[in-house]
Swiss-Prot record:
Domain of life: Eukaryota
Similarity field: Belongs to the TFIIA subunit 1 family.
Expression sites (tissue/organ): Testis specific. Detected in adult testis mostly in round and elongating spermatids (at protein level). Detected in testis.
GO cellular component: cytoplasm; male germ cell nucleus; transcription factor TFIIA complex
Chain segments carrying region Disordered: 309-427
Any GO BP: transcription initiation at RNA polymerase II promoter
Keyword Transmembrane helix: no
Subcellular location(s) of the protein: Nucleus
Name this polypeptide is given: TFIIA-alpha and beta-like factor
Keywords, sorted A to Z: DNA-binding, Nucleus, Transcription, Transcription regulation
Pfam families from the UniProt entry: TFIIA (PF03153)
Function: May function as a testis specific transcription factor. Binds DNA in conjunction with GTF2A2 and TBP (the TATA-binding protein) and together with GTF2A2, allows mRNA transcription.
Organism: Homo sapiens (Human)
Amino acid sequence: MACLNPVPKLYRSVIEDVIEGVRNLFAEEGIEEQVLKDLKQLWETKVLQSKATEDFFRNSIQSPLFTLQLPHSLHQTLQSSTASLVIPAGRTLPSFTTAELGTSNSSANFTFPGYPIHVPAGVTLQTVSGHLYKVNVPIMVTETSGRAGILQHPIQQVFQQLGQPSVIQTSVPQLNPWSLQATTEKSQRIETVLQQPAILPSGPVDRKHLENATSDILVSPGNEHKIVPEALLCHQESSHYISLPGVVFSPQVSQTNSNVESVLSGSASMAQNLHDESLSTSPHGALHQHVTDIQLHILKNRMYGCDSVKQPRNIEEPSNIPVSEKDSNSQVDLSIRVTDDDIGEIIQVDGSGDTSSNEEIGSTRDADENEFLGNIDGGDLKVPEEEADSISNEDSATNSSDNEDPQVNIVEEDPLNSGDDVSEQDVPDLFDTDNVIVCQYDKIHRSKNKWKFYLKDGVMCFGGRDYVFAKAIGDAEW
């Protein structure tokens, strides 16, 4: 059933999808491809160490295999038919048989599990001849992508032969499934091993690389001499172009400003003249003058005691005045007529035909009419004042309401059930269990105290192991 476990395949697909999703982002940021590979390897190692699933690498499409790179000092030691890795806890890994060993090349194939192996300190490599090799520091044999030496350790620190010091290096190339080869390398490769698992370039290499990078960025002396004047010329040209409006066209700008001022002053005077002319010849002014003439004629007819038949004829005479105002001499004619009417009125008031009673009556009526017109004008003026007062009152009311709203919101902003003493420390207790199911459900059926759950597309952690399922049915009593 282990080969049918879909958890490793699911986890690997998730890891690969995430790595492929961020590959372009890493490339845009200028991060090396090796960093992405190390991230993937670290992720897989974390999943393996969590022990949530077994056979994480065993069920992969290409099983990772391991290569043991042995120094020449171990050639004579491994001249035996079999050798095995013996763990102090008692677990013995499958043994391998050495077929042919020579001075330049050695190969040994043996069956080995297809997933990374963590070898703690104290593990010994034992051969049939009786030679023992003890591991001084913990190592892990993992998968590599083509080149050897992903996890390398200092010389004379990884493996130590009891009685004779020796070194062994581990790496992982892609080889045939379910086989492992042990090959020998020259001692010069052993000397390049660093004291940390990660492979880092040496100091001189970094300095050389930095010098190369610097030489790529800097410009040669000749080119620099050539580029700088061009940059200065471009800068001067651009600055000259920018300074043209200030140097060349400054008189024109000032002249334009003076012209604008003259045009503005001329337009202002023209507007004033037009405004005055419009006031003098506007229909409103003519209507006001027309009303004044009508009032004068009415008063004159009343003072002389004219009948109602003669009044329309006297009213018709000034009614033609607005029509005649369309002529160029309308203002002159209007002023002459008003002056004549005023003179005639004064002469007629002082005439012998008038009596004191008529004069008093005329003055009384004139005062009444003026008072009536004044009341009308006053009423017209009072209406906007009342409207303005009401508008100002509404504005003040809205302003006061706006000012009061934040206070109300501040009072109402108290969170609901703020007085409840709910501690978040109680929440983890709900999930303090080894068995957790995260899934979706189709339906839940209950009969009295018996429940039946129809679940789908979930992950279940049971006893520290992860299981995935497409559909599941569970029963419970509660």
